[in-house]
Each structure stands twice: as structure tokens, then as C-alpha cells.
């Protein structure tokens, strides 16, 4: 007897949202890569536009003490030669390049009568230089991710496109590890507002990584690379140098005595 297939119902005829997303996965990936490219371009451009703006997010107070100043006058940015301070005599232990940067900052000493004064931490040029370098480094990473997303959009070969997507996922994974370390151990260096913003950005980056990973679930090389790295370290921990076994002197002597008897 020939089995007759049941007619599909109206519910079965309707395409579910999952089926639509599954069939148009490549289109959704392209749209998502465009979104990533736009976001990373904004982040990188903002970092290059104001690289020292991150210092406003640090946890400091105006009572923090920074660079030592042993004069009653203030550091000014005036172009008059008569009002310039001889920075070489005040900061003999610092490099000449840093000494030139001192003229960009001004300290109000009108209310202080002591001879020994300090530059507050938020006006310390060394701290500002370090924060600026860190911001530029993060901006370079954002621009690099923008270029990866752009190249993945341009490429037509699936193999090259998958390699670029895996590279972006790997970079996002290590950035998540770094942000996890900052949130767990270095949270006290940020103000409360900046710390909440850091948590929000961490959640957004985690959602970004999860969305891109599940959209490209066929590309599992990231997990294989990570698992291989962890397995290698575990193997290194388990391996012990095998030393040659020394002969047991007591057992050999006892056997020799028995043979003589």
C-alpha cells in the first residue's frame, strides 16, 4: 500500500522567524558587519580626536599630590619671556621633553603661602601622557577592527571571509579578557560614573561577541584554537621529566646472599 503524506497545515506553511534568519544568514552577517564597522570607526575616531579625555574619568581628588614644585609662583602658559619660569632649575630630574610640557599647565597658588607646593595628580603631565598613549592604543585597535569588518564585507570568497571573521572574534575575545581583568582588579582607578559606563560597555562588547559568534556558528576555528591553547598549557603542566630508576641496593644484596646459601 502506498502511504499518503498528510497535507501541510497552515501553520506549517508559514515560515518561522528562525527559518527566515537561517536562510538569509549571510545577509544578516553582512548587515551586522556594517554595523560593527560603523561603531568601531566612531570609537577610533573619537579616541584620536580627544586622546587625553580619559583622564576626566579617573578617580582622583584635587587634594592628590603629584609633581613637586618648590617655588611660590605658578606654571603658566604665557608667551612673555619675563613671566616664564625656569623649569630646568625646578625639575632637574625630569627629561627636557617633559619639562617643555610643564608650561601647558597652570597652578593657582594665590591662596598658598608655603614655599613647598605640589601639582595635583590630574594636572601631572606624566599621567596625562600615559593616559593619552593608552587611549591611542585602544583607538588603533578599534580602527583595526573596523578595517577587518570592512575587508570581510568586500571579500566574496567564503574562506577568506571566514578567516577575517575569526580574526575579529579572536580579537574581541582577548579584549573581553582584558576588560574582565580591569573590572575585577582595577576598578578603583575609575570614578563611579566611569565604572558604570565601563560595565555598560563591557556588556555591549559581550553581546557583540555573542551575536557575531552565533551568526557565524559554522566558523568554529576560534573555539578550536582556544581549546588547543588551553590543552597545550595543561599538557605542559602534566608533563614531568622522567628520571632513570636507580637500582635497589637492598634487594640485590638479599638476592645474592640467598644464591650463596
Swiss-Prot record:
It is a multi-pass membrane protein. Its main location: membrane. One of its GO terms (cellular component) is membrane. It is found in: Membrane. Disulfide bonds: none annotated. Keywords: Membrane, Transmembrane, Transmembrane helix. The chain crosses the membrane at residues 38-58, 134-154, 163-183, 195-215, 219-239. This is Uncharacterized transmembrane protein DDB_G0293304.
Amino acid at each position: 500500500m502506498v502511504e499518503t503524506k498528510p497535507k501541510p497545515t497552515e501553520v506549517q506553511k508559514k515560515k518561522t522567524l528562525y527559518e527566515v534568519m537561517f536562510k538569509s544568514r549571510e545577509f544578516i552577517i553582512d548587515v551586522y558587519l556594517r554595523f560593527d564597522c560603523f561603531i568601531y570607526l566612531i570609537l577610533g575616531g573619537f579616541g584620536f580626536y580627544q586622546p587625553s579625555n580619559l583622564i576626566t574619568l579617573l578617580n582622583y581628588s584635587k587634594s592628590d599630590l603629584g609633581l613637586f614644585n618648590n617655588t611660590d609662583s605658578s606654571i603658566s602658559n604665557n608667551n612673555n619671556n619675563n613671566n616664564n619660569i625656569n623649569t630646568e632649575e625646578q625639575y632637574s630630574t625630569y627629561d627636557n621633553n617633559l619639562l617643555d610640557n610643564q608650561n601647558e599647565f597652570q597652578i593657582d597658588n594665590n591662596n598658598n603661602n608655603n614655599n613647598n607646593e605640589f601639582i595635583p595628580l590630574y594636572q601631572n603631565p606624566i599621567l596625562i601622557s600615559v593616559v593619552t598613549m593608552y587611549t591611542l592604543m585602544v583607538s588603533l585597535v578599534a580602527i583595526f577592527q573596523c578595517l577587518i569588518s570592512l575587508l570581510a564585507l568586500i571579500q566574496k570568497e567564503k574562506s577568506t571571509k571566514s578567516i577575517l571573521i575569526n580574526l575579529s572574534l579572536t580579537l574581541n575575545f582577548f579584549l573581553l579578557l582584558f576588560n574582565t581583568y580591569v573590572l575585577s582588579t582595577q576598578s578603583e582607578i575609575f570614578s563611579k560614573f566611569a565604572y558604570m559606563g565601563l560595565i555598560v560597555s563591557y556588556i555591549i562588547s559581550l553581546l557583540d561577541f555573542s551575536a557575531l559568534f552565533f551568526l557565524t556558528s559554522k566558523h568554529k576555528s576560534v573555539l578550536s584554537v582556544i581549546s588547543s591553547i588551553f590543552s597545550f598549557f595543561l599538557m605542559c603542566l602534566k608533563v614531568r621529566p622522567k628520571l632513570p630508576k636507580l637500582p635497589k641496593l637492598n634487594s640485590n644484596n638479599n638476592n645474592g646472599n640467598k644464591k650463596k646459601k
